[in-house]
Amino acid sequence: MDYLVKAIAYDGKVRAYAANTTETIHEAQRRHNTWPTASAALGRTMTAAVMLGAMLKGEDKLTVKIEGGGPIGAIVADGNAKGDVRGYVSNPHVHFDLNEHGKLDVRRAVGTSGTLSVVKDLGLRDLFTGQVEIVSGEIGEDFTYYLVSSEQVPSSVGVGVLVNPDNTILAAGGFILQLLPGTDDETITKLETNLSQVEPISKLIQKGLTPEEVLAAVLGEEPEVLETVPVRFTCNCSKERFARGIIGLGKDEIQQMIDEDGQAEAQCHFCNETYLFTKEELEALRDEI
């Protein structure tokens, strides 16, 4: 089962998050039929979104959107404080040969000219929006830059996805380390040294390391785990929600659907679920107006 952990380390000077998202990203790949490079880009983004969501409280939620100008188009992911995450890419059928490091060429798929935005719904009247320029297109580095620039928290983000030859997901996961105010230079140096030597997060997950063990590896010491949260692909779409959207089109538009097609089909971007509305259902919706 996928899950994430929230922890502290170095006598409370470092806040840390780590997640195994393998099953969750496998479900996203299955629903969207993403090709390997698109799977890696979507998986990295969803993993980051679920860890950012873990920083929220209660019913708070967020939406991440990456638009880098590459062939994959936009990558969108929703996360919340409960470990729910969902996501999609504009063009799921993108794949390139491995890059010079022998890894999936996510940068080429995402592009390097555009923005990463995070919109938080904290239950207040206004939404909180943070936006930064994309700095690498590799996604982990872009989220690091977002946290440092937009939220002013010195951070390190690692996200990774390994894809099997048959397109299924072999391993997926990530970590976020954040320095709290007053962190001393010795701790910073130790973390930097450790991060430069540790294996990629996807390799650690593939080897069977738990999120707790991943944090111990990247931190260089055992973390104090504060909370464990299950992670899962969850979509809150429903036929009722789409019905409300159809009603919002107005009587004339609904009548046109009835006259031209005798039915209507609505598809959720996030989970690819399709909802069919029969002629009788459309007439009932029309008559509600």
From Swiss-Prot:
Annotated compartments:
Cytoplasm
Q: Which InterPro entries match?
A: Heat_shock_Hsp33 (IPR000397), Heat_shock_Hsp33_C (IPR016154), Heat_shock_Hsp33_N (IPR016153)
Query: For this chain's UniProt record, which GO biological process terms are given?
Result: protein refolding
Cross-referenced Pfam families, in alphabetical order? HSP33 (PF01430)
Q: Could you state what the record's PTM comment says about this protein? A: Under oxidizing conditions two disulfide bonds are formed involving the reactive cysteines. Under reducing conditions zinc is bound to the reactive cysteines and the protein is inactive.
Can the keyword rRNA processing be found in this entry's annotation? no
Which GO terms label this protein's molecular function in UniProt? protein folding chaperone; unfolded protein binding
Q: Give the signal peptide as a residue range, or say none if absent.
A: none
Cystine pairs: 235-237, 268-271
Q: Name one GO cellular component term.
A: cytoplasm
Q: Does the keyword Cytoplasm apply?
A: yes
Tell me the domain of life.
Bacteria
Keywords carried by this UniProt record:
Chaperone, Cytoplasm, Disulfide bond, Redox-active center, Zinc
* Database matches in NCBIfam families: PRK00114.1 (NF001033)
**HAMAP family of this UniProt entry?**
HslO (MF_00117)
The entry sums up its family as follows: Belongs to the HSP33 family.
Query: What job does this protein perform?
Result: Redox regulated molecular chaperone. Protects both thermally unfolding and oxidatively damaged proteins from irreversible aggregation. Plays an important role in the bacterial defense system toward oxidative stress.
Name used for this protein in its record: 33 kDa chaperonin
Organism whose genome encodes this protein: Bacillus licheniformis (strain ATCC 14580 / DSM 13 / JCM 2505 / CCUG 7422 / NBRC 12200 / NCIMB 9375 / NCTC 10341 / NRRL NRS-1264 / Gibson 46)
Taxonomic lineage of the native organism: Bacteria, Bacillati, Bacillota, Bacilli, Bacillales
